[in-house]
Curated annotation (Swiss-Prot):
Membrane topology label: Multi-pass membrane protein
Keyword hit for Oxidoreductase: no
Alphabetically ordered keywords of this record: Cell membrane, Membrane, Transmembrane, Transmembrane helix
Origin superkingdom: Bacteria
Gene3D superfamilies on file: 1.20.120.1630
Designated name of the protein: Uncharacterized protein YpbQ
One of the Pfam families matching this protein, by short name: ICMT
Disulphide-bridged cysteine pairs: none
Originating species: Bacillus subtilis (strain 168)
Encoding gene, per UniProt annotation: ypbQ
Membrane-crossing residue ranges in chain numbering: 1-21, 41-61, 68-88, 123-143
InterPro entries associated with the record: ICMT_MeTrfase (IPR007269), Metal_cation-efflux_comp (IPR052527)
Upper classification of the organism: Bacteria, Bacillati, Bacillota, Bacilli, Bacillales
Location relative to the cell: Cell membrane
Gene Ontology MF annotations: protein C-terminal S-isoprenylcysteine carboxyl O-methyltransferase activity
Length: 168
């Protein structure tokens, strides 16, 4: 079951990166400006290291699924629904990079009606829940901290770009 989960998550991330590349091309044709380029490689690296850490901790420490695995898995699936709701709500404006088309109105539909950054909430929950599924507490704690640091930089950069270039 562990390797199936890892395979699903890796395929999901690869598909999201492909969508992000397509969306980047679309919005750049509309005049999108990229922000936060300097921290972007750190975000990619953190996500790769998250998976490597999770695999290492589960295998080397012979971690087994939590006795609460069914409930945790149900929450993870619910979080995925929010992920794709956010992605679909942004349409071509969804990206892993900070790309802002000057003068375009901020999206206020889907989960963006209630939250400014629902996809970041999804990532926070995934970094907590996926390791929790296998009792990989070291990975959960370390990467929650790394993610918090990176998101504090990223969200500030994104908010500044949106504030400056988007129509409210």
């Amino acid at each position: 079951m562990f390797w199936l989960l890892i395979a699903i998550l890796i395929v999901q991330r690869a598909a999201e990166m492909a969508v992000a590349r397509q969306n980047e091309q679309k919005v750049k044709k509309q005049g999108a400006i990229e922000f936060g380029e300097s921290h972007y490689p750190y975000i990619i690296t953190m996500h790769i290291l998250f998976f490597l850490s999770l695999i290492a901790e589960v295998l080397l420490m012979n971690k087994q699924p939590s006795s609460w695995w069914l409930g945790i898995a149900a929450v993870i699936l619910s979080v995925q629904i929010v992920r794709y709701w956010a992605l679909c709500s942004l349409g071509a404006y969804w990206n892993t990079k900070i790309l802002v088309v000057p003068g375009v109105e901020l999206v206020k539909k889907g989960p963006y009606k209630w939250m400014k950054h629902p996809n970041y909430a999804v990532v926070i929950l995934e970094i907590l829940l996926i390791p929790l599924l296998y009792q990989a507490y070291v990975t959960m704690c370390l990467f929650s901290i790394f993610n918090a640091v990176l998101l504090s930089v990223r969200i500030r950069a994104e908010d500044k770009a949106l504030q400056e270039y988007s129509v409210k």
